């Protein structure tokens, strides 16, 4: 069932691309790619058009809507405190591969080819512009993924292959990190599959994350970029760690007590608390019936 649903969604998302070029064609991904952002009447740039609040300011505590997380992930998210990002050893952490395509208000990317300087063989792609400098390499030369015991990094280990005019990338060896910036965790046992499809000057990337530790079903999300050749992706921001936590004892880790419940998001928007907690059932259209029943029950209180 999980495989059937995934294939159907990918086919729906990229079905129009099939008519752009023959099945054997390989689209050109090289260039500067900009995250689309809304432009205000005065010309100022506002937040991006896709999931703006989640990707810029970040989701509110307790907002797990649309995430097929299990109870273990939910408990870890409830215990998470944003102050953990103020620890000196964490202030320079980049966004992990599981999230970096969406993070930092939406990254602006440079995609370039990696060419062997001696043989001129095309080895892969380099993608730069991610928050914190966790730039990625996608190997296209057929090399295998390393042992499960090999080092896990922020960018993971990625290999790609062409499926018609769509690039499919498989990433493993990712650090334990997060899939959303309010504590929703991702484990080092996850696998990420990405599908890159170009529609003229638009590049759509569908991400599918399988995580046996924290997800009940694969998490699927898409992001869109616009080809912007006049853009120039700069160097990563340098971090200078400082004490932001005050007089805390050495080794203290910001956290909420196990069993805590983040209810502010549900209260603020008048959403039944149960509907904010994620889970695979909340990602399907049929959940609208459950939501209606929860709202009716909420109205009687």
Question: What are the residue ranges of the model-derived segments?
Answer:
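Bacterial N-terminal signal peptides
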Residues: 8-19
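PEST-like low-complexity, intrinsically disordered acidic/proline/serine-rich tracts
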Residues: 24-301
């Amino acid at each position: 069932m999980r495989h059937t649903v995934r294939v159907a969604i990918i086919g729906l998302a990229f079905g129009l691309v099939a008519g752009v070029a023959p099945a054997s064609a390989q689209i050109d991904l090289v260039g500067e790619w900009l995250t689309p952002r809304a432009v205000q009447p005065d010309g100022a740039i506002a937040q991006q058009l896709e999931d703006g609040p989640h990707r810029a300011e970040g989701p509110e505590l307790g907002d797990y809507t649309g995430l097929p997380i299990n109870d273990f992930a939910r408990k870890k998210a409830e215990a998470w405190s944003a102050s953990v990002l103020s620890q000196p050893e964490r202030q320079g952490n980049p966004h992990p591969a599981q999230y970096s395509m969406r993070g930092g208000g939406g990254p602006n990317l440079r995609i370039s080819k990696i060419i062997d300087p001696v043989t001129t063989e095309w080895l892969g792609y380099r993608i730069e512009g991610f928050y914190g400098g966790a730039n990625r390499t996608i190997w296209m030369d057929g090399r295998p993924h390393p042992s499960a015991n090999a080092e896990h990094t922020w960018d993971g280990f990625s290999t790609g292959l062409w499926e018609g005019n769509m690039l499919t990338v498989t990433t493993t060896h990712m650090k334990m990190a997060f899939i959303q910036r309010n504590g929703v965790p991702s484990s080092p046992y996850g696998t990420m599959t990405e599908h890159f499809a170009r529609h003229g000057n638009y590049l759509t990337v569908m991400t599918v994350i399988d995580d046996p530790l924290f997800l009940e079903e694969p998490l699927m999300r898409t992001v869109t970029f616009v080809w912007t050749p006049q853009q120039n992706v700069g160097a990563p921001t340098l971090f200078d760690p400082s004490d932001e936590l005050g007089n805390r004892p050495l080794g203290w880790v910001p956290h909420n007590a196990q069993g805590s419940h983040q209810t502010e998001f549900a209260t603020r928007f008048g959403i039944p608390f149960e509907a904010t907690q994620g889970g695979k059932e909340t990602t399907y259209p049929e959940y609208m019936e459950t939501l209606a029943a929860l709202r009716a029950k909420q109205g009687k209180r």
